[in-house]
Amino acid sequence: MNYFILILVAALLILDVNCKKDGYPVEHSGCKYTCWKNEYCDKVCKDLKGEGGYCYINLTCWCTGLPDNVPLKTNQRCNGKRK
């Protein structure tokens, strides 16, 4: 039984587990993608290797299933200014 647990833990550590995350992706300037249509956001999110996305109430793109290496909006700064 102990060997099974040890092998299971070792296998989990060896496997590269890629977690997916949801959120507002940012452009190079640090600003969120602005939008009017869901189709635009869906394309942006899929171009970033996400599962999909939609235009949220505040007219910015919300993406689902993004890889870990895609930066998400974490503060209110855009182009170095508070927005």
UniProtKB/Swiss-Prot annotation:
GO terms for biological process: defense response. Has the structural arrangement of an alpha-helix connected to antiparallel beta-sheets by disulfide bonds (CS-alpha/beta). It is found in: Secreted. Belongs to the long (4 C-C) scorpion toxin superfamily. Sodium channel inhibitor family. GO terms for cellular component: extracellular region. The lineage of its organism: Eukaryota, Metazoa, Ecdysozoa, Arthropoda, Chelicerata. SMART domains: Knot1. Residues 1-19 form the signal peptide. Keywords: Disulfide bond, Ion channel impairing toxin, Neurotoxin, Secreted, Signal, Toxin, Voltage-gated sodium channel impairing toxin. This is Alpha-toxin CvIV4. One of its GO terms (molecular function) is toxin activity. Negative results: has a minimal effect on Nav1.5/SCN5A and no effect on Nav1.8/SCN10A and Nav1.9/SCN11A sodium channels.
